[in-house]
């Protein structure tokens, strides 16, 4: 089932006083996006996460939304009346997971390229919800864009994380026994009748916990893509085994 995590916004402002004395110019917004990507991956590596890779369709969704906020000076995850999931889908990205960070920054003295990239990245990193998105272990793709309002000079940044639907985990739970069984998958309970099979598709790592009839302790496993777990009765006892798919 596709997952859309809770989306959090960050608004950061720099007062003229704190900007005094710094070198300013017109930031290269394409370079800012590249630097934010590099710094995001550095932070992920520092926390033991795999780096994410730029995805053209996520980049397109980020550019479109950043440009909209810059044109309208409307700010928020649904500023255009749509969700991040709807925007990435419109660009042809079929997602299993999609997460979004946004930021709004302004300084009357402007920003340099390096400074703007640093403020965007650190602003997200210092916010628990945004940092959680940046460190999500199961996203693989990223899209980043920054746009500036011609009216107010405000910069709007969008960072999208995604995992394609094609990378979902698919596995089966089979009950070859003559009795119904109960099991939990990531905390959700299921009942499986005798001699029946159920297929599951998950976007995140799954934990399967099976309660076997007559056994006091449940059995927990982490299914991989293509796995088949089968409950069978051997003599008077029930057992769970990983069967050939």
Task: State where each predicted segment sits.
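Extracellular beta-sheet/turn segments enriched in Thr/Pro/Gly and aliphatic residues
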Residues: 217-245
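Short domain-boundary/entry signatures in modular proteins, especially
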Residues: 160-170
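Short, well-ordered surface patches within globular domains
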Residues: 20-88, 137-143
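Short, solvent-exposed S/T- and G/P-enriched segments that are highly enriched in secreted/extracellular
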Residues: 186-202, 219-225
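A short, solvent-exposed beta-strand micro-motif common in secreted/extracellular proteins
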Residues: 204-217
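Asparagine-centered strand-capping/turn motif at beta-strand->loop junctions
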Residues: 169-180
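A well-ordered secondary-structure block
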Residues: 84-162
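Bacterial N-terminal signal peptides
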Residues: 2-13
């Amino acid at each position: 089932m596709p997952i859309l995590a809770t989306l959090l916004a960050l608004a950061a402002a720099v007062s003229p006083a704190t900007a005094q004395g710094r070198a300013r110019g017109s930031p290269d917004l394409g370079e800012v996006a590249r630097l934010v990507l590099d710094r995001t991956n550095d932070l992920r590596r520092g926390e033991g996460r795999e780096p994410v890779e730029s995805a053209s369709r996520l980049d397109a969704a980020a550019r479109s939304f950043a440009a909209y906020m810059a044109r309208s000076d409307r700010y928020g995850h649904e500023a255009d009346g749509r969700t991040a999931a709807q925007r990435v889908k419109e660009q042809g990205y079929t997602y299993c997971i999609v997460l979004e960070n946004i930021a709004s920054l302004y300084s009357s003295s402007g920003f340099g390229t390096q400074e703007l990239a640093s403020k965007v990245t650190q602003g997200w990193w210092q916010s628990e919800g945004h940092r959680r998105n940046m460190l999500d272990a199961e996203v693989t793709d990223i899209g980043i864009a920054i746009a500036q309002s011609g009216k107010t000079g405000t910069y709007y940044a969008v960072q999208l994380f995604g995992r394609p639907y094609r990378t979902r985990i698919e596995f089966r739970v089979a009950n070859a026994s003559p009795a119904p069984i109960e099991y939990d998958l990531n905390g959700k309970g299921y009942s499986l009748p005798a001699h029946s099979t159920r297929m599951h598709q998950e976007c995140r790592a799954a934990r399967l916990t099976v309660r076997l009839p007559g056994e006091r302790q449940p059995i927990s496993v982490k299914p991989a893509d293509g796995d088949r777990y089968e409950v069978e009765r051997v003599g008077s006892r029930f057992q769970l085994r990983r069967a050939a798919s």
